[in-house]
Amino acid sequence: MTSKEELLQELSEAIISCKKDAVLAAVEKAKQVMEPAEIIENGLAAGMNQVGVLFERGKLFLPHVMMAADAMTAGVKVLEADMPAGTETKKLGVIVNGTVEGDVHDIGKSIVSTMLQSAGFEVHDIGRDVPIKNFVEKAKEVNANMIGISALMTTTLQGQREVIELLKEEGMREKVKVMVGGAPATQAWADKIGADCYAENASEAVAKAKELLVGK
């Protein structure tokens, strides 16, 4: 008889291998002895967290991350189909994520969106080169708890401050947390502009989002 720990390890390793078939096979085995929520949180999401760490260390690359996320989505869909009617995977929070106006780089931001989604957040990725007002309008539209603002150049960093200022003007700052990131951003910069947190990479973005939105 395979233990729960071994099944969770198998789920995690299947995600890291980026093989959808292996993930689905592991899910089928695990659901005989575990609840869907446990399989998702302690098996699939744990594997996806490890994928994020390996990506940051240069051990895995962007295609691997996307394949792993796709495999996890497939596994979650199987589990959701088995849940009683009226239940669904609990969302940890709603996040709007984008790269500020004037900045056309978005690989790092896309990785953050993928990792946040895999961790259980509802993510609205609004792309790159996004006008300041669009961040706030989207947050209003989807009733977001957090906005993630990426800037990859020193010339576009100011856009992060402008989003925060606009949130204040709209009376939304108390309700919406702000996370900043990108190569020129630092914790000191986040403190200076009044952001709630700074994330150096995708793994840290997930940890900080959980801390701010779930850890209360």
From Swiss-Prot:
Pfam families: B12-binding (PF02310), B12-binding_2 (PF02607). One of its GO terms (biological process) is methanogenesis. This is Dimethylamine corrinoid protein 1. Keywords: Cobalt, Metal-binding, Methanogenesis, Repeat. Residues 1-91 form the B12-binding N-terminal domain. SUPFAM superfamilies: Cobalamin (vitamin B12)-binding domain, Methionine synthase domain. Gene3D superfamilies: Cobalamin-binding domain (3.40.50.280), Methionine synthase domain (1.10.1240.10). The keyword Metal-binding applies. Belongs to the methylamine corrinoid protein family. SMART domains: B12-binding_2 (SM01018). PANTHER family: METHIONINE SYNTHASE. Residues 92-216 form the B12-binding domain. The lineage of its organism: Archaea, Methanobacteriati, Methanobacteriota, Stenosarchaea group, Methanomicrobia. Pathway: One-carbon metabolism; methanogenesis from dimethylamine.
